[in-house]
Structures are given as structure tokens and as C-alpha cells.
A protein has these predicted regions:
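Classical nucleotidyltransferase
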Residues: 116-223
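N-terminal amphipathic/basic-hydrophobic helices that include classical n-h-c signal peptides
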Residues: 1-17
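Short acidic-hydrophobic, aromatic-tinged amphipathic segments that line or gate anion-handling sites
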Residues: 19-25, 106
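Residue-level signal for inorganic ion chemistry
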Residues: 44, 97, 136, 196, ...
Length: 276
């Protein structure tokens, strides 16, 4: 049975007034505020709960509010064999976070130097010295520091020493199941797109550049636009009804995710026939 996938192909960015830092050198107006930390892959309902709780705290105390996230996603950094893992691209993540009207986004380069920081070093350097965070929001299963030895207990332990308060967001559940990026990735591989859309509170989409095909489809009456999946998690192979957004158009179509089934190709592609 066909499920609905929503691939979006467009260039615009929605970051707007959200300041993006690619290092941790914050301007004075963004220091000493409320910070939420996490991968935020998918920016799903669970993430949205963390963001909204942190945002309320910032408003209540008249403080700046920002998010710290990591690039690449640590799982992909530690295991180079994992190629297809993301729910959203980094650009999509920025755009989704910007919709919450946060003041700033810090994208930490997750590299060998950063991974070697102990949990206390992370708290001292990032939370205390660089951002001077007053209120820190994380989810219940947050792990950090070298070998992921840091936990919410570690955050609580160092609160007084480094002058912050950590607040733990309880997992959000739907149908008695925890909403997580891991569970959403699994549903994507199963092709359960409508379920995913409910957990994201929006239509899941794939964003990328159209790649030049061999135009063989055009010759047999089925012109297609091809999109590489890059490091997106691979949906269940098959045919989906889609909406396609380009720089100057928004149309419906039919997409096939597979290995060029007509011509025995080896590249995994999202091939879309756009109506009209």
C-alpha cells in the first residue's frame, strides 16, 4: 500500500532573527540565559516539549534563550559505517528551530577534540565559562562528555560549583510509547509516514538539490526529478504520493524510492514524477 511522503526541494532558509553561532563565542546579550542541549534530530514533539519549557523559563526571568546542538550527529561521528541516519538535514533543523523564535543557536563541531572533553570539562568550559548559562534544559536520557559518562546526575552534582540550575524534561509519550528520534527513524524505515507526521507535528520532508539524470524517463513519457538521499534515513522502498516544493513552484507528484528499478541502476534515489 502506498503511504504519503512529503519531499520538499527548496532553497529558502527560515532562520530569520535567530543568531547562529558556529563557535561558542557568544555576544554579551546572549550570555547568562536559558539553554537547551541536544541533537534535536527531527525536532519532534518530545524536543518541542523541551524547547517550550525552556522558553517559558526564559520569558519568566526575562533572559535570552538558546539551543546547543552538535554537527555531525555524534552517532555518525563515532560510527563511520552509519551513512543514512538523519531525520532532518542541518538546514532543516535550523529552520525548524527558528520557528520557535529562539534567540540563538550554537552548533558545536563534534570532532576529536570535543569528544575528548570529560563531563566536568564540558560543564566548566561550555556551560560556565563560554555561555554562563543560568538554567539548563535537557531530556531525561541526556548523556555527554568523554565516553558518554556524563548524565543528569552529573549535571545536578556541579550546579553550585558552576552556578547554574539544571531542569530535566520528562519524556513525552504517545500511546504509552516514548517519542524519540530512534523510534521515528524506525518508523521511517517501515514507511509509516502518517504516524511520523503526527510525532513531528508536521509533514516529514526530504530536502536537497535536484541532480541531473540521464533523461531516459522523459523519453518514455515519465519525466522525473531525481534527488539523492545523502545522509537521510532511508524510508521503506516503494512508491509514495508526494508534494514537491521548488524555488518557484509547489506541486503534487508520485515518488519512487529505490535503485532505479526500470534500468537496473545501483544508486539509491528518490525519483519524482511531478504532475502538471
Amino acid at each position: 500500500t502506498n503511504t504519503k511522503l512529503r519531499p520538499s526541494i527548496f532553497k529558502m532558509s527560515l532562520s530569520g532573527s535567530m543568531k547562529i553561532y558556529k563557535n561558542i563565542r557568544l555576544s554579551k546579550k546572549h550570555r547568562g540565559g536559558v539553554v537547551a542541549i541536544g541533537n534535536f534530530d527531527g525536532v519532534h514533539l518530545g524536543h518541542q516539549k523541551v524547547i517550550n519549557e525552556a522558553k517559558k523559563q526564559a520569558k519568566k526571568n526575562n533572559l535570552p534563550f538558546g539551543i546547543i546542538t552538535f554537527e555531525p550527529i555524534p552517532t555518525m561521528f563515532f560510527n563511520s559505517k552509519i551513512k543514512n541516519h538523519r531525520i532532518n538535514s542541518l538546514t532543516q533543523k535550523k529552520d525548524q528551530l527558528a520557528k520557535f523564535k529562539i534567540d540563538f543557536l550554537i552548533i558545536i563541531n563534534f570532532n576529536k577534540n570535543f569528544r575528548s572533553l570529560t563531563a566536568e570539562q564540558f560543564i566548566k568550559k561550555v556551560i560556565y565559562q563560554k555561555t554562563k548559562t543560568k538554567f539548563l534544559y535537557v531530556s531525561k536520557n541526556f548523556r555527554f562528555g568523554f565516553k558518554r559518562l556524563g548524565s543528569i546526575q552529573t549535571l545536578k552534582k556541579y550546579e553550585k560549583l558552576y552556578n547554574y540550575k539544571s531542569l530535566i524534561t520528562i519524556f513525552l509519550k504517545k500511546n504509552k510509547k516514548i517519542i524519540s528520534s530512534t523510534s521515528i527513524r524506525k518508523k521511517i524505515t517501515q514507511g509509516k509516514i502518517q504516524e511520523i507526521n503526527k510525532l513531528l507535528n508536521r509533514e516529514w520532508s526530504i530536502k536537497g538539490r535536484v541532480i541531473k539524470g540521464q533523461k531516459r524517463g522523459r523519453k518514455i513519457g515519465f519525466p522525473t526529478c531525481n534527488l539523492k538521499l545523502n545522509d537521510y534515513i532511508v524510508p521503506r522502498l516503494g512508491v509514495y504520493s508526494v508534494k514537491v516544493r521548488g524555488a518557484k513552484f509547489y506541486k503534487k507528484g508520485i515518488a519512487n524510492i529505490g535503485y532505479r528499478p526500470t534500468f537496473n541502476g545501483q544508486n539509491l534515489l528518490l525519483e519524482t514524477n511531478i504532475f502538471g
